[in-house]
Amino acid sequence: MSQKILIVGAGFAGVWGALGAARVLDGAGVRSSDVEITLISPKPELQIRPRMYEAEPHKMAAPLLPLLDAIGVKYVEGSVDAISVQDRTVSVVSANGQIRSLAYDRLLLTTGSQLSRPPVPGLEHAFSVDRIEDAVELDNHLDKLAKQPASPARNTVAVVGCGFTGIEVATELPKRLREKFGADAAIRVVVIGTQDAIGPDLGPNPRPFVAEAFESLGVEALLGSGVVSVDAGGVRTASGQRIEAGTVIWAGGMRASPLAAQVSSNLDPLGRVEVAPDLRVPEAPNVFVAGDVAKASTDDSGRYALMSCQHAIVMGQFGGHNVAADLLGVPTLTYRQPFYATCVDLGEWGAVYSEGWDRQIKLTHAEGKARKQMINTQWIYPPAPNRAEALAAGNPQASFG
């Protein structure tokens, strides 16, 4: 009977995890009939989540079946709703509600993160760009608004959250809204955040460029007061201010997949599993975790991976390598990713690209935009379904420093 590696999730960590695991088996000359790799996800696609703030979100997915076929990885459609580390099984629910149990010898959990939705009254009226389905719903809503008579409320969008997502959504909106409402429409975009500075996690170096972009694009920032309620006509802040807005977009932070709690009791405040240096779960040594669901040290300086595709891709490579290596009795690798870069899209102003954890500015305006477009349209997409090229892309020691 063949041994089984299950990869749960088809985000960046899951896809590159499949590449990494297949590469190890190929290098060891192990046949798929002896060790079977299976990837489980609701759809055989990689949603290019960093692009959900852009126009035409329905196009932001990469098909996976040709790639998985090329590297000998099986695909199972469905969502995992339960994991038993004692029995080494997962419960998979298909789209039609059918439930089945799959056994594993090694498990790689890569179910990522999801938008944090606190108990704010009326939050169901807010849109998001968390998944393709959410971003398409927002796009359809804007199309419907375009058919309504112009009014200040129709032309106003309130973006709740002033982090990376909120910034990129807000700075892209003026162009998108003019394309839908007309070039002369009096557009208003307001970013609302509880912090006293825009992009609180960005640090001091990129922030002046974000402020410059906001001013250039006419994006307003209402800081120091969070949203306490949402309704179909706008939001109310903690300071009592009412903003009439036909569209509210919630970008209020992320939390790890709740499946994390089923493989470990040692979670950080974001719900991520605190993993060993090789991404193994100490409490469940047959389980490895990668991507947004893992709290993993990137270097020896006390830095930890962020919830980003940049870290998820490389963590996936290491996680896939290690889950296969461990099954074969080969030493695992310590996850290391000392290089870190940040590229924030700022709409028609351009983008700001920085390197290092202190975010030293390298490119801005049009040059930054060119780098961002390269990242968004090339670097974060899976390789072509060519076996040699795909397996090479799974090498954890050959990318991103």
What are these regions (language model features)?
Residues 1-77, 168-201, 249:
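Beta1-alpha1 glycine-rich phosphate/pyrophosphate-binding loop at the start
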